Amino acid sequence: LGGRQILMPKYYTNLDELEMKLKTFSFRVTKDKCLDLPPKIYMFRDVHLNLEQKNIYETLRKKARAIIADDTVSFANKLVEILRLHQICNGFLKTDTGQLHVFKNNPKLKELLRILEEVDGKCIIWATYVHNIESIKQTLGDLYGKDSVVSIYGKDSVEDRKLAVASFQHNDRCRFLVGNPSTGGYGLTLTAARNVIYFSNSYNLEVRKQSEDRAHRIGQKNKVSYIDLIVPDSIEMMIISALKRKVKLSAQTLGEEAKKWL
């Protein structure tokens, strides 16, 4: 079987020319100019890995650096190593054999529970991995009652998602919505939320922006707090940096001033 070549951009050129060409057939009005919405408030909460996580993370980080530097290794295999580092930050690791190793006393889950005790109102909790979504939902159901939490992710049917949204929006007993931003981050109205917590992020800026705006749209009367759980000096900081670079590039392409974000 033949391999597939993937070209990776290292820098961008002629952005001014691209901007001028876009202006000839496009007109853009931002949400800020059309709607009078309360502000978004961004916060970070540092999460420190436990000893087992640290040891495995450092071992796999050294391995990942060697693999990424090796030009003979496929791009897909390099991505697997990055994915594993991200999994460790989020409390689990999928091995080569497909087995799931779950770290005891997940520090991120503990920090999430602390945040939920501090904040008022309803909360959306976005997580990238199915394991985290199911674990968070189970934990919150045990602590606050099964009717306090609903989920939206790939395993849920369209009808179940509609029921979850309706319960979150209108049922006072339902305080938490846990979901994957790629599944629940588009088109839904979740303005009952006053807090949006990112248990984890991906490199996809569109998914991030769209998932933020499920709570911050017409009908929202309160300030919305966005809280990111981040492991310092880890792959998660690289993901945040990549998202910020994409925001700046987008603004530059559209001829706008990049707003402070995150």
Task: Report each predicted region and the residues it spans.
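Short glycine-/polar-rich loops that comprise or flank the Walker A/P-loop
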Residues: 40-42, 145-148, 191-195, 220-226
